[in-house]
Amino acid sequence: MERQVLLSEPEEAAALYRGLSRQPALSAACLGPEVTTQYGGRYRTVHTEWTQRDLERMENIRFCRQYLVFHDGDSVVFAGPAGNSVETRGELLSRESPSGTMKAVLRKAGGTGTAEEKQFLEVWEKNRKLKSFNLSALEKHGPVYEDDCFGCLSWSHSETHLLYVADKKRPKAESFFQTKALDVTGSDDEMARTKKPDQAIKGDQFLFYEDWGENMVSKSTPVLCVLDIESGNISVLEGVPESVSPGQAFWAPGDTGVVFVGWWHEPFRLGIRFCTNRRSALYYVDLTGGKCELLSDESVAVTSPRLSPDQCRIVYLRFPSLVPHQQCGQLCLYDWYTRVTSVVVDIVPRQLGEDFSGIYCSLLPLGCWSADSQRVVFDSPQRSRQDLFAVDTQMGSVTSLTAGGSGGSWKLLTIDRDLMVVQFSTPSVPPSLKVGFLPPAGKEQAVSWVSLEEAEPFPDISWSIRVLQPPPQQEHVQYAGLDFEAILLQPSNSPEKTQVPMVVMPHGGPHSSFVTAWMLFPAMLCKMGFAVLLVNYRGSTGFGQDSILSLPGNVGHQDVKDVQFAVEQVLQEEHFDAGRVALMGGSHGGFLSCHLIGQYPETYSACVVRNPVINIASMMGSTDIPDWCMVEAGFSYSSDCLPDLSVWAAMLDKSPIKYAPQVKTPLLLMLGQEDRRVPFKQGMEYYRVLKARNVPVRLLLYPKSTHALSEVEVESDSFMNAVLWLCTHLGS
């Protein structure tokens, strides 16, 4: 019998990629004020923001679209789009005022380089631009932060001031030999470096400023800034402790001050992106006296504080610090008037049956409170799905809003006055936009969802979730009885399964997970004729805290065994072509892929990795997350730790490079030269080792790309190269 014919011609694969990459992704949504028509009908405007790959311009474009939702207070009566999509160029942040009558927009304009770009803060009212402030020209601070870690754009409750976060203004610096600045009448006072406010400091032009690591290289020392909209005056708030970097700020009740999260940056900064374990606390700074008050435990990590509609309580997420980067979190509640903090939802060690398995989201949506300030709505991975939940902050009860559905994954974009705006997708259905009202307490599972934007499903992709129980010899001694899952995609129109090749994808992290949502690469591969196995090995998020804690100290062993076990089980049950199995993974997924071709060289016929961890020991001194190297190798981390020989040996023992002599699988390496998380020298180290052993290996080095290789030009090129590599070495 002939083998399964793969879509292997470059032109065909490129055409398929071009078509699928046009699927847009939802990035944000907000709800306008309620409007009552002259006939008594009520409606609200839904403003949505989307991103889409543009292969002609080789960039991600952003666009917006508005919808009208007519309702009766409890349910949606009618909903539909209000006009076509419009591209939003230059918008970095935007936020509606509390009343919905104004909108603030942070916009970049000017040249292509960061030095030439200018930032403007605009205030819009109805059909006109009311105010525009050239923040770059005012020189009160550096660039404004637009990221979701530190960044914010918050209206005061009075709608007279705007709060945002920007980089602290740096003093000017110049050479010791800058002749135009030379003053022949210089005195001893000048030599003592007593400077005028804007006078340049000699010899500081190469002074090192720490940043916050991967994807945050332009962020160093954030400050809280307040713009008086009427006068145009900008104030940089004082009172923030010198030892912390502020972010995620909002106005306190009554506009008396500002609440913010402060991250410790002493003795040095660690990478903060995708790391919910960075020591931080909740603070309040009073605007009248500049006094700063600590509102939470300062020995843990906190994120995404959200003020209730009645301005009485603040809910936020809390995680242990300096342990695994992502883990099960606590939902905490701070009462503004009693000053009491309570834990609403605690860490869940292990899921029991169909019960809630814990909170694993890294951020709460900006809008997450119910109208009565009693319930909080959020999304979180639960095993291999992502569901919506409502938690009663008084009772601590957690109820699923999406249980018993079609098995796809949900994401909450916002909720306001109990009207929820959500995204839904599956591995075979791209994201769709839905709205629905939060039912009364006790009836949460009765949500009636109405679609605003539907995506066409792909009937030629079928998928399922496989539950896997490790064999007894692979059980964890301390955390026995843990299972794990894998999501299997396969062509639904395949004539003969025994001829279908399979691509195995372990996720990165390692403490993250695949969920049953739309993913471009797996969908592409499946439409090309591959089965795709996405493995959530033990240590993945969504399966309870015990599962996460089982992996540190066992990387390179437990996770590798889990992936291999999943592969063998699926091959046995589905009867795919065992002679054509390939691996594809990035970061820790690349780490596992390189382990697997070394530990099980007979199983895999091809391998593609992106920015893989190859040698934990050599990575520790160059990564922005040295704590990852220590913790995942099974050791505790502190900022002053100096590993001894036994620690270095353990790191090396758990690294893929240990098994390099056994590797014979053809390998495609794809590296980002600007990667701060897993520096590209890791992949180079492996490349040279394999080249010296005559293993077929190809290296693609993307000069300006970072860890995710997510730039449109890089992503598209890397996918095409990966596809051709698989087709070459698996046979078409």
UniProtKB/Swiss-Prot annotation:
E.C. designation(s): 3.4.19.1
One Pfam family from the record: APEH_N
| Keywords annotated in UniProt | Acetylation, Cytoplasm, Hydrolase, Phosphoprotein
**Which reaction(s) are listed as its catalytic activity?**
Cleavage of an N-acetyl or N-formyl amino acid from the N-terminus of a polypeptide
This protein's source sits in the domain of life called: Eukaryota
Q: What processes in GO biological process is this protein linked to?
A: proteolysis
**Residues the record lists as N-acetylmethionine modifications:** 1
Active site residues according to the UniProt entry: 587, 675, 707
Instruction: Give the modified residues of type Phosphoserine.
Output: 187
Task: Describe the family membership recorded for this protein in Swiss-Prot or TrEMBL.
Answer: Belongs to the peptidase S9C family.
The name under which this protein is listed is: Acylamino-acid-releasing enzyme
